[in-house]
Regions:
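Signature of extracytoplasmic/envelope-associated structural regions
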Residues: 1-295
Length: 295
């Protein structure tokens, strides 16, 4: 009897540096497409040939995305490291029926999701060189923590030495802007007869990083100092976690770092004001500015 692939049965593994990390996800998707080029076949002698021929010999880069909880334990910190450093890894998606491999994957976007009364989470999206089915899971499996703890965040934001209160929503997002080096040769095109012999991208390079986000605040009578304003040299820090200080803090932290921001009013049923910010300084180590702090 045939076996179906169900998303609810999926197990996700990241393999980096020879180690295998199992990541519990709440959702995942992935795909890869091939490039198709058409060419005319109509001639003076075959005017009825109005449908063009097709050439398929190369693939686009694969895409993937998944969501994961930002737990207190350190089981998922490999994701933070791969995001900050834009390092390649292999991503495996295992079902009851099959194993799918995304080879030479890189994270292009990591969104740190911070909402009141909801556990911290991270949304990841990225690209990969090649997607294959029927793969074999590799790497040395690392042990997992015995506990699995969520964090309902306490939010602490300071902008230009002033504390922002009455926060409705916060977002932090790191983008890795990459470019794939295509692998296209005459010999490769001639030898491409099916998907396995198609030409795939050969490598990627990092062009730039963008660290930005948003802060949505209830608009009150005593917090209007930055309403409809902007600043290109603001100092911003954000902490969303268990509310502890120092080495006991668990959760997301950003800054203090130099940023630009614009502020705008949102006139809904309850008036809000939103800060759209972007980091403008270039730290020696991004890991000292943006942190997912765990046990």
């Amino acid at each position: 009897m045939s076996t179906y692939n169900f998303k609810k049965e999926v197990k996700v593994y990241v393999v980096s540096g020879g180690n295998q990390y199992q990541i519990d996800v709440s959702d995942i998707s992935f795909s890869q497409t091939f490039k198709e080029t058409s060419y005319p076949v109509k001639t003076l002698h075959t005017l009825s040939n109005v449908f063009e021929g097709s050439v398929i010999n190369s693939a686009n880069n694969a895409d993937f995305e998944f969501s994961m909880p930002a737990i207190v334990e350190a089981d998922y910190t490999i994701i933070e490291s791969l995001l900050l450093q834009a390092e390649s890894f292999d991503l495996f998606v295992k079902t009851e029926a099959d194993v799918f491999k995304l080879e030479t994957a890189v994270i292009t976007n990591g969104s740190f999701v911070i909402e009141r009364s909801r556990p911290l989470s991270i949304n990841i999206s990225g690209e990969a060189l090649k997607l294959t089915r029927g793969a074999t899971l590799t790497g040395t499996a690392l042990s997992r923590s015995a506990t699995f703890s969520f964090t309902i965040p306490t939010i602490d934001i300071t902008l230009n030495s002033s504390s922002l209160s009455n926060i409705f929503r916060v977002g932090i997002e790191l983008q890795n802007d990459i470019s794939w080096t295509p692998y296209k040769t005459v010999n490769g095109a001639l030898s491409s007869t099916n998907a396995s012999t198609s030409m795939y991208p050969s490598s990627f390079s990092l062009d730039k990083k963008i660290l930005s986000g948003s802060i949505t605040q209830y608009l009150l009578s005593d917090n209007t100092s930055s309403t409809q304003d902007w600043d290109t040299d603001a100092t911003l820090s954000i902490k969303a976690g268990n509310g502890a200080s120092g080495s006991n803090f668990r959760g997301f932290s950003f800054g203090p770092a130099t940023c630009s921001f614009t502020n705008r009013i949102n006139a809904g049923e309850v008036f809000l004001q939103g800060y759209d910010w972007r980091m403008t300084e270039n730290p020696t180590s991004l890991a000292t500015i943006l942190k997912y702090e765990t046990d």
